[in-house]
């Protein structure tokens, strides 16, 4: 299974908009490739994430769970990238300070 971060972003946009056209506008891509990518994601996962009709899109139970997990994954990736950047710039790190008493008793 090879799920790309962009697939998670695409799914989140469709899940939040509940409309492929609006999600495509939000993502600045055309609607047909967005639909294809969501179908590919569903095939990779092996579960239907969205219930589609001619006029609407609804999340399935699997889709609701996947939405929560996808949001958490993207947040983790963003936080990891931010921490790595701060460490690289010296803004974050770990300092250990030790103390030994050598005063006579």
Outline where the language-model segments fall:
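N-terminal short secondary-structure element
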Residues: 1-37, 51, 57, 66
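N-terminal winged-helix
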Residues: 31-32, 36, 82-105
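A short LG(V/I)-centered, amphipathic sequence patch enriched
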Residues: 42-59
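Alpha-helical linker/hinge and terminal dimerization helices associated
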Residues: 44-45, 66-88
